[in-house]
Amino acid sequence: YAQELELLEQDRTILENVDSQEYSEWQLRTALGNFLFYDNDVFKKVETLSPGEKARVALCKVLLQKANLLVLDEPTNHLDPETQEIIGGNFNVYTGTIIVVSHNPSFVEQIGISRMLILPSGRIEEYSRELLEHYYDINTPICTDIC
């Protein structure tokens, strides 16, 4: 994700940055709409966007690439809580593996993780998805060793 953010072409529009031969303009605009870019917003130059808007373009671009593995390092850093909630739901349709580093438990829950590795005291502990319901009550690790 960070690489995609750095590779956005600043002098091109949002639509041009996510353009792909695999998708029609309608499909691209629909995908961008899922990341809160509507109507003529898609014709804005990337250089005019806020950091949060650039993050949304990069995340949309990542999902459109159909990679089988996504590595996301703090993908919600530049997003307000309402936008995080909307954007997080877009990852539910992704069928590959997502490795995400995040301090945002609500985003992690939204993207539908099945396992979580947490570093509560400098060592990795693995927890089940149910931990998200009791995020601040970290008492029952499934495993405390790295496999």
Language-model regions, residue ranges each:
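ABC ATP-binding cassette signature C-motif
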Residues: 1-147
